[in-house]
């Protein structure tokens, strides 16, 4: 949204000091910039050089039925950065990710609840009610719920690992379209956004996010996912897109 560019690391690396994750294993360090050039400058200053990236996979919209008027320019940007179409790989990922939006709140919420536990009740009034409710739900997850979510997480991770043996990166939409109004920011919209973005978080993948201009002048978003920091070819894709 808002035409900004972004980069997020994998959760096992923290080059910027004095920052700690509120949801260990899911929150990551990252930064935003107003252009691809700015993101290149900041990322070079923090990370140094990057490994090269070859061709990636354009994985479509995971079967979420994104409006073709939105999906077409997202696909065009994916192809511009070097992604190719591979229907079999895209279908493998779609099938593996069907329950990602369900598993992420369970695992991420439980991890976050452990961090917030010392002050969650004492400072309840300082939280947005919806946020507090999610953290409260996180600390009440049963062992059975956590095991079931872990099975889903493993399925998503395994699908990405299989795809990364043939493709250097995976490109997916990051949004369903342009930013919606506050009134439309309901749980249904949140769940659809999670369906697009939870797979990368569950698999712990570093990513680049880029804005995609739509015909009405607004922007949607695209995410470019890499297997790990050792193969995080952020420079290659940003240079193709700038």
Language-model segments: what does each one mean?
Residues 39, 116, 171:
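Residue-level signal for inorganic ion chemistry
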Residues 1-63, 205-242:
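Structural helix-boundary/capping segments
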Residues 20-22, 105-108, 189-191, 197:
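Short Gly/Pro-enriched turn/cap motifs at secondary-structure boundaries
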Residues 44-109, 139-140, 213:
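Gly/Ser-rich, acidic/histidine-flanked active-site/gating loops
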Residues 105-154, 209-221:
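Short helix-loop capping/hinge segments that flank enzyme active sites or metal/cofactor-binding pockets
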Residues 70-89, 117-122, 145-167:
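Acyltransferase
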Residues 2, 34-44, 69-73, 107-111, ...:
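Conserved active-site and cofactor/substrate-binding residues in soluble primary-metabolism enzymes
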Residues 145-242:
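Glycine-rich, small-residue loops and helix-cap segments
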